Amino acid sequence: MGKIINTAYPITTVNGIKVNTSKQCHSSNKENYSTRSIDYIVLHYTGKDTASANANYFTGANRQASAHYFVDDNSIYQSVELRDKAWHCGGSTYYHSHCRNTNSVGIEMCCTAGNY
């Protein structure tokens, strides 16, 4: 059984970096929930740009994807409330037998190739 999440922004600082919530994902790119059970953390590597630029992109409508967090070396943006479902690990095809958008938190690592 996973961690029950019923709050929007439980994390405010990570390693001295303030979590910025100013760039919220457009409502067409996520689903609202009042509570969720989290069993998995999904990490993706964007391969380009900054956390700010990626978070800004998802403020637009009809992107058909989203993530809870965008992270780079100097900043963290939370664009989807943790209690809500982001669309970060597939919709019609899943590659893991149990991990789904509904039971996971999506984190996008925003860095250029070779800058890990």
Model-derived features with residue positions:
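Active-site-adjacent loop/helix surface patches within enzyme catalytic domains
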Residues: 2-116
